[in-house]
């Protein structure tokens, strides 16, 4: 392995999946020293340090296949709620990548929009993406420069932006995956084009 500092993924959460794919298993093998999650998705527990914090009665898993087509979503009737995942992180600077795909896009139309925020334990926003339309296209949003001066918990929060009473379930948020990448602390000798190697690997896997 290279002796140069590199970006490394610390969480690869395949939301809604009940097992890692073959690619996911290979990926876990490559980053066995840095990845903190040993299962694709779960409810939060203090012991493991990560997971969704919404009551299990509100959310469900859907889909099969790749990282995009497996999703965590709200059960019908649990409207206008924020979906939150919590993660324990060491001090450092991070990027958070959220992946999206709506299998019900033909019914949602333009109603499924989300605001994405990353916040610290005090609730202070560390990064925000104001408006992302979740559609039938597989895509992702990257939030950068998330810095923790000391170890602690962060939350990734997905909040609905639209309220259309006639199509209320289709206004609710859903998520395909969450990848958290720790940025290399010092990169004096690394060409700029290589600084996102770990992140690129994470996204490439998600698209397979």
Task: Give the label of every model feature segment.
Residues 3-186:
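Compositionally biased, intrinsically disordered or flexible polar/acidic segments
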Residues 1-6, 183-208:
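Beta-rich interaction/scaffold domains
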């Amino acid at each position: 392995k290279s002796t140069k500092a590199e970006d490394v993924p610390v969480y690869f959460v395949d939301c809604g999946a009940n097992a890692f794919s073959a690619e996911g298993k290979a990926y876990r093998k490559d980053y066995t020293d840095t990845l903190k999650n040993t299962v694709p998705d779960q409810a939060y527990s203090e012991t493991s340090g990560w997971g969704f914090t919404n009551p299990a009665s509100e959310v469900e898993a859907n889909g099969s296949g790749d990282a995009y087509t497996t999703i965590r979503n709200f059960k019908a009737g649990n409207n206008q709620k924020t979906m939150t995942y919590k993660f324990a992180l060491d001090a450092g600077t991070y990027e958070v990548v959220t992946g999206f795909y709506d299998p019900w896009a033909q019914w949602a139309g333009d109603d499924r929009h989300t605001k994405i925020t990353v916040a610290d334990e005090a609730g202070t926003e560390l990064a925000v993406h104001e408006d992302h339309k979740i559609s039938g296209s597989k895509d992702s949003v990257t939030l950068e420069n998330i810095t923790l001066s000391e170890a602690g918990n962060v939350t990734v929060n997905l909040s609905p932006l639209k309220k259309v009473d006639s199509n209320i379930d289709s206004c609710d948020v859903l998520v395909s995956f969450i990848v958290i990448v720790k940025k290399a602390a010092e990169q004096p000798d690394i060409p700029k084009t290589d600084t996102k190697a770990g992140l690129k690997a994470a996204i490439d896997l998600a698209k397979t």
